[in-house]
Amino acid sequence: MKKIVLYGGQFNPIHTAHMIVASEVFHELQPDEFYFLPSFMSPLKKHNNFIDVQHRLTMIQMIIDELGFGDICDDEIKRGGQSYTYDTIKAFKEQHKDSELYFVIGTDQYNQLEKWYQIEYLKEMVTFVVVNRDKNSQNVDNAMIAIQIPRVDISSTMIRQRVSEGKSIQVLVPKSVENYIKGEGLYEH
């Protein structure tokens, strides 16, 4: 049975902390396949400074090239509009019948899982991998995996704000992503 990890997020933009999460999960679980799953629109997030999806996909590919593993699952992008993880996982599972699916979330998402659409069915389809960046270890449900990672206080919101203020984002994102953001004039206003 194949072990497949799905790491969802807006990735607007993808940054160094996302890379750390991906790397820690990849090396801990050693999956057969690892997918970044960019959302078109998350039902539980604000959509400020929304850029063209192609820019996000390009930056994710840059991260994949740098990490040396991973692929992009663009199911939610193709579907457009608001995407629910349940619908995405259900469709993905139909394409990957003989697979164990692992879905990466942060403690912030873990704490609001009960708000997720069809969460009880979703829990039956995937094993949640809860990534914790706090000092204290995370207590999770028995059917979930908790992975402690180094705390890195970087957010996509912070990066967008720094760019709009003309501040440096060096080391917050890989050089390739920094150059891309500057070259395309992303997040400048």
UniProtKB/Swiss-Prot annotation:
Keywords: ATP-binding, NAD, Nucleotide-binding, Nucleotidyltransferase, Pyridine nucleotide biosynthesis, Transferase. Pfam families: CTP_transf_like (PF01467). Pathway: Cofactor biosynthesis; NAD(+) biosynthesis; deamido-NAD(+) from nicotinate D-ribonucleotide: step 1/1. It catalyses: nicotinate beta-D-ribonucleotide + ATP + H(+) = deamido-NAD(+) + diphosphate. CDD domains: NMNAT. It comes from the Bacteria. Disulfide bonds: none annotated. GO terms for biological process: NAD biosynthetic process. One of its GO terms (molecular function) is nicotinate-nucleotide adenylyltransferase activity. Its EC number is 2.7.7.18. Catalyzes the reversible adenylation of nicotinate mononucleotide (NaMN) to nicotinic acid adenine dinucleotide (NaAD). Belongs to the NadD family. HAMAP family: NaMN_adenylyltr. PANTHER family: NICOTINATE-NUCLEOTIDE ADENYLYLTRANSFERASE-RELATED, PHOSPHOPANTETHEINE ADENYLYLTRANSFERASE. This is Probable nicotinate-nucleotide adenylyltransferase. It comes from Staphylococcus aureus (strain bovine RF122 / ET3-1).
